[in-house]
Amino acid sequence: MALDRILYRLAYRLGTPRWDTGLPQPELEQLVQGRAPGRALDLGCGTGADAVYLAGHGWEAVGVDFAPEAIAAAKKKAADAGVTAAFVLGDASRPADAGVRGPFDLLLDIGCYHTIPASRRDAYVAGAAGAARPGADFYLAGIADPPRLWRLLGAHGIGADEVKSRFGPYFSVADQQRRGTHLVAYHLVRHDQQTG
């Protein structure tokens, strides 16, 4: 198991990791406000706050994460909230291998892609594209340019040029927002034609 995966699993075993606020992302609330519910896939769902939020608003929500501790916490969070959401143990870069079946109307990745090594990023993008319905929204957020320490802990960043080149065959960039010094968020839309 890679060092970054060991560190993430250890963080969940020690309690709630610093990055887990337990609250849905405000941008997610804005993205789905006034929109008819559909199917949503949370890639790298962690403890499930976003999937639980979506399920509570009528969405059929599925979360996938490689950390068993995170999946267990997500299932508990859904049960405590009285909502039905599916949480699957698996690799976010290959959701179909974990039994996750699309198509989905909304995909989320809040803090997962920036930890995926370059060698697995093409597989991740292809997996996300394969799970997305034509016209689906994909909210991708994470660290744009990680400081040295974060790189040592497995953060690789999400640069605008990379998003255009890797995601471009499948998704259009509808919006990009820089948040603070290191964070970036992209609103991508799946092309109408199924590419790849």
Where are the model-predicted features located?
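Class I (Rossmann-like) S-adenosyl-L-methionine-dependent methyltransferase catalytic domain
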Residues: 1-43, 47-102, 116-131, 136-196
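A conserved beta-strand element that flanks and buttresses the S-adenosyl-L-methionine
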Residues: 108
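Short catalytic micro-motifs in class I SAM-dependent methyltransferases
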Residues: 111-115
